[in-house]
């Protein structure tokens, strides 16, 4: 199948001798991608590892994972099984399983120095995503479907088969005489994607829908390029984890572009895991235009007027609770922590406002002098232990020697200007 090589060449960004990982469930799509991508990597003197996540949701899942491993071992492909051993929620199981799957895959890739995780989303998956979002009232960004590349923390998710029909993958496996597994949830009418799949779609209809999704993708690329120019002129970010925004610009640009800008800022500052609902962002934009003197909230952020601008800061009530310092963690999906040379057990990381509220109980009689707005103090990260506050780095306060403390760096999981939407 030449389509994979063409797609990966268009995506680019691989090493001369690429090391890639592929998420493989044992279904026809992921098996076909694994075999094809392994050949692609080998032709370039690179290497591929296949990763199967056993969610432990069905009694037969462990046996299925072993079967996949045997198939791939027979082809000389390295394979690892990653187990989701956490307690399972009573509701939202599909969403929880998806989150766990990507977390386990990302952790393996990062720990093994692999920068590229490939998944087997194909043309019909893209069409289903488009139809689901259309029914939900999505705008252009949502109707563009899935990007061919998505940034994750420490790696990128690559979907090289988005233009390839599922039938082509079945035909490839048949030619290879490669068996595959079937996931019963793909036919369960309780799930919206399964209901869409039950509606037969001829090739002409599928090709037309896929072309339409690509058109939306190109529109999204153009909008993102314009948005990046606006963000560069209207928004400044601070390493303490907040943004300052020029409100005058909101009234001068297209309302939809303004809403996309506000959503991008909120995702960056608040660290939300999923895109924001369009109607909520629209209400925020309208509110900021009508009553700019009022503070507002969205997606774990507060939009607060301050000296002719508005600041976007973390909403304390939506923040992660204080937690023990762990090297390499990304606390509250916002602050990266590096360990000190000497372990310091008992240290807790949180925001100042999550600890005692008086200056003396925090560890200083008077708040340190700082150019930062006072309204920001409650959502500044701090280290706490015995006998109280140990450090508030962004205020320049350190009870212990700074070099002996963990380092806290703002590292938003959602960049303000992430890699652009990719259409191949």
Residue ranges and their predicted role:
Residues 57-62, 187-190, 293, 315:
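Acidic, metal-coordinating catalytic cores used for nucleic-acid/nucleotide bond scission
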Residues 57-58, 94-95, 158-159, 186, ...:
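A generic secondary-structure micro-motif detector
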Residues 78, 160, 167, 207, ...:
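Proline-centered helix-kink/hinge sites
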Residues 115-116, 122-280:
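Flexible helical/loop "lid" subdomain adjacent to adenine-nucleotide binding pockets
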């Amino acid at each position: 199948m030449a389509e994979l090589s063409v797609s990966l060449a268009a995506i680019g960004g691989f090493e001369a001798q690429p090391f890639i990982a592929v998420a493989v469930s044992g279904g026809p799509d992921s098996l076909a991608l694994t075999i094809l991508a392994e050949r692609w990597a080998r032709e370039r003197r690179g290497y591929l590892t296949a990763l199967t996540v056993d969610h432990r949701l069905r009694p037969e899942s462990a046996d299925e994972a072993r079967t996949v491993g045997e198939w791939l071992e027979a082809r000389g492909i390295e394979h690892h099984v990653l187990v989701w051993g956490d307690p399972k929620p009573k509701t939202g199981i599909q969403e929880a399983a998806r989150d766990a799957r990507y977390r386990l895959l990302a952790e393996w890739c990062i720990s093994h120095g692999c920068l590229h995780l490939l998944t087997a989303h194909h043309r019909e998956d893209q069409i289903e995503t488009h139809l689901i979002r259309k029914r939900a009232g999505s705008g252009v960004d949502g109707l563009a479907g899935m990007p061919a590349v998505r940034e994750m923390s420490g790696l990128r998710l690559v979907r090289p088969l988005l233009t390839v029909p599922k039938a082509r993958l079945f035909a490839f496996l048949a030619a290879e005489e490669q068996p595959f597994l079937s996931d019963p949830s793909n036919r369960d009418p309780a799930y919206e994607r399964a209901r869409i799949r039950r509606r037969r779609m001829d090739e002409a209809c599928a090709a037309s829908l896929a072309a339409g999704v690509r058109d939306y993708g190109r529109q999204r690329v153009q909008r993102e390029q314009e948005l990046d120019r606006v963000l560069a002129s209207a928004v400044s970010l601070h390493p303490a984890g907040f943004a300052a925004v020029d409100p005058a610009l909101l009234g001068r640009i297209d309302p939809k572009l303004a809403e996309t800008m506000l959503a991008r800022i909120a995702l960056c500052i608040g660290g939300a895991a999923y895109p924001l609902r369009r109607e909520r962002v629209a209400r925020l934009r309208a509110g900021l235009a009508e009553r700019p003197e009022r503070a507002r909230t969205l997606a774990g952020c507060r939009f607060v007027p301050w000296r002719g601008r508005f600041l976007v800061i973390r909403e304390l009530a939506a923040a992660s609770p204080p937690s023990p310092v762990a090297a390499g963690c990304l606390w509250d999906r916002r602050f990266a922590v590096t360990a000190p040379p000497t372990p310091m057990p008992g240290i807790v990381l949180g925001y100042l406002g999550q600890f005692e509220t008086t200056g003396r109980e925090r560890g200083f009689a008077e708040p340190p002098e700082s150019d930062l707005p006072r309204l920001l103090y409650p959502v500044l990260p701090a280290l706490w232990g015995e006998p109280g506050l140990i450090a508030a780095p962004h205020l320049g306060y350190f009870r212990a020697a700074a070099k002996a403390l963990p380092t806290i760096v703002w590292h938003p999981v959602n960049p303000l200007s992430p890699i652009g939407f990719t259409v191949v």
